Regions:
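NAD(P)-dependent aldehyde/semialdehyde dehydrogenase
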Residues: 66, 70, 79-177
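Conserved NAD(P)+-binding/catalytic subdomain of aldehyde/semialdehyde dehydrogenases
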Residues: 1-90, 94-95
């Protein structure tokens, strides 16, 4: 469905435009003719990460871990990892990474199982993303949690082009620093 002509006509009579999308979409709209005083407010492609200090994490109460996991779930899953606040990477710092990771991901998995519905389109796109990442990255290991609603790629700390590595529908990348 190409609405380019409609967008061009609306742009010609706009005093302001709010442009929201990836860099390609923003650039497409910027090329359209607009009135001289038209103001563009852009929300282009963003990239979010999470950094967890495992030495502090192990000292959290179960209630605080559950609260943190819920916030991670809301930032990631409610927008299918397509919002600017949705983390793609989780960087773990500290000596207690392995025990912290298990506890964190188990909590996320539990919340996902209770609150997230997965449709056929999402399953297909997640598989497509999985194959694409398998081809393009050097993974240490891949962790599937139960029914595949949470997928974690563990990557060495030598990452090239991090901005091009993206998860979708519960696919995350983690690095131990």
């Amino acid at each position: 469905n190409d609405n380019s002509e409609i967008y061009k006509q609306v742009s010609l009579i706009s005093d302001a435009r709010m442009l929201w999308g990836g860099d390609d979409t923003i650039n497409k709209f910027r090329k359209m003719e607009i009135p001289e005083r038209c103001l563009d407010i852009t929300f282009s492609d963003r990239y979010s990460i999470a950094v967890i200090n495992s030495n502090n994490f192990v000292n959290l109460s179960n209630k605080d871990i559950e609260k943190m996991s819920k916030k991670f779930f809301y930032d990631s899953y409610l927008s299918n990892q397509m919002a600017c606040n949705s983390p793609h990477f989780v960087f773990w710092i500290g000596e207690k990474s392995l025990s912290s990771q298990k506890k964190f991901w188990d909590n996320v998995k539990k919340i996902v199982q209770d609150k997230y519905l997965f449709n056929d389109f999402q399953i297909y796109k997640k598989y497509e993303n999985f194959i694409s990442n398998l081809i393009s990255q050097n993974f240490i290991k891949i962790i599937f949690l139960d029914d595949n609603k949470v997928r974690i790629f563990e990557i060495s700390n030598k990452i090239n082009n991090i901005e091009n590595i993206r998860g979708i529908y519960g696919t995350f990348f983690q690095v131990n620093l």
